[in-house]
């Protein structure tokens, strides 16, 4: 049963509202719009705004009270852009280039069944690094994800980067199926909470699938300002919401 008083539901996107990198189903979309009649809803994802639109619809800022791409470094409230932060002014060009060069050099040494293109994607608030390359097909994505579960390719890459860039104020966070994010310390999904913590909510619920240590939902999931729920799929998210808000 939900706690009394004004509340907000914040949802991760991949694995929580949609299958990884897939569009939201009509059933889930309809369910969330019904839920919105009872409670404010928002989304927070690591992906950029265009990818959030691809998955949740071009009208995403009209369908959710809050939309936080890139962990909230880009923020929309009530359909309007609130703010946009950028990584280069915070970290400086020298560190960004060192990081990009090191990642490309590391990727060049990994042998995988397949490699495609877009190994590093530069976003407003982070770098997204993918050993297989973001332009892989859905089948290639699943193949890499299964291999990564056995061989911990991303985990080893991140461990190496943490050692190489220790003391540089960087966080490395694994999310989704094929990549991990690199951003300044404190720019994880908790960043979005600064946009909502003064809006009068008694409870902020968070739903995410990568809630384990090292996962990109972990920090916001364990933050004392949220009530965190770990989910395994969109169906699981819906089930928990129905229990809480029926």
Curated annotation (Swiss-Prot):
Residue positions, PTM N-acetylalanine: 2
Top class in the EC scheme: isomerase
Active site: 12 (nucleophile), 14 (proton donor/acceptor)
Gene Ontology annotations of biological process type: GDP-D-mannose biosynthetic process from fructose-6-phosphate; GDP-mannose biosynthetic process; GDP-mannose biosynthetic process from mannose; mannose metabolic process; protein glycosylation; protein N-linked glycosylation
Keywords: Acetylation, Congenital disorder of glycosylation, Cytoplasm, Disease variant, Isomerase, Magnesium, Metal-binding
Binding residues for Mg(2+) 1: 12, 14, 209
Outcome of substituting residue 37 to H: In CDG1A; partial loss of activity
Mutagenesis or variant effect for residue 132 to F: In CDG1A; slightly reduced activity
Binding-site list for Mg(2+) 2: 221, 223, 226
Compartment(s) where it occurs, according to its Swiss-Prot or TrEMBL record: Cytoplasm
Pathway: Nucleotide-sugar biosynthesis; GDP-alpha-D-mannose biosynthesis; alpha-D-mannose 1-phosphate from D-fructose 6-phosphate: step 2/2
Keyword Isomerase: yes
Entries under Pfam families matching the protein: PMM (PF03332)
N6-acetyllysine, modified sites: 149
Outcome after substituting residue 139 to K: In CDG1A; this mutation seems to disrupt a splicing enhancer sequence and thus results in most cases in a protein with exon 5 skipped; slightly reduced activity
Catalysed transformations (reactions): alpha-D-mannose 1-phosphate = D-mannose 6-phosphate
Amino acids binding alpha-D-mannose 1-phosphate: 21, 123, 134, 141, 179, 181
Effect of substituting residue 176 to V: In CDG1A; loss of activity
One GO cellular component term noted in the UniProt record for this chain: neuronal cell body
UniProt xrefs under InterPro entries: HAD-like_sf, HAD-SF_hydro_IIB, HAD_sf, PMM, PMM_cap
Gene3D superfamilies attached to this UniProt entry: 3.30.1240.20, HAD superfamily/HAD-like (3.40.50.1000)
Disorder named in the UniProt entry: Congenital disorder of glycosylation 1A: A form of congenital disorder of glycosylation, a multisystem disorder caused by a defect in glycoprotein biosynthesis and characterized by under-glycosylated serum glycoproteins. Congenital disorders of glycosylation result in a wide variety of clinical features, such as defects in the nervous system development, psychomotor retardation, dysmorphic features, hypotonia, coagulation disorders, and immunodeficiency.
Quaternary structure and partners: Homodimer.
Family: Belongs to the eukaryotic PMM family.
Physiological role: Involved in the synthesis of the GDP-mannose and dolichol-phosphate-mannose required for a number of critical mannosyl transfer reactions.
Protein name, per record: Phosphomannomutase 2
Organism: Homo sapiens
Gene name in the database record: PMM2
């Amino acid at each position: 049963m939900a706690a009394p008083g004004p509340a907000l539901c914040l949802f991760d996107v991949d694995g929580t509202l949609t299958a990884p990198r897939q569009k939201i189903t009509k059933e889930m979309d309809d369910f969330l719009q019904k839920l919105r009649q009872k409670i404010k809803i928002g989304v927070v994802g690591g992906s950029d705004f265009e990818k959030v639109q691809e998955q949740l619809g071009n009208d995403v800022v009209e369908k959710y009270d809050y939309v936080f791409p890139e962990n909230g470094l880009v923020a929309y409230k009530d359909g309007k852009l609130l703010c946009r932060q950028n990584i280069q002014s915070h970290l400086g060009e020298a560190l960004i280039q060192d990081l990009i060069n090191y990642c490309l050099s590391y990727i060049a040494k990994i042998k995988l069944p397949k490699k495609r293109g877009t190994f590093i994607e530069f976003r407003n608030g982070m770098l997204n690094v993918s050993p297989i390359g973001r332009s892989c097909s859905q089948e290639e994505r699943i193949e890499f994800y299964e291999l990564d579960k056995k061989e911990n390719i991303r985990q080893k890459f991140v461990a190496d980067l943490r050692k190489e860039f220790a003391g540089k104020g960087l966080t490395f966070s694994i999310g989704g199926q094929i990549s991990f994010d690199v951003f300044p310390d404190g720019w994880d999904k908790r960043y979005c909470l600064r946009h909502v913590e003064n809006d009068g909510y008694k409870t902020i619920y968070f739903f995410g699938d990568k809630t384990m240590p090292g996962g990109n939902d972990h920090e916001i999931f364990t933050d004392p300002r949220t009530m965190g729920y770990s989910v395994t799929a969109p169906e699981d998210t819906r089930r928990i919401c129905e229990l809480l808000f029926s």
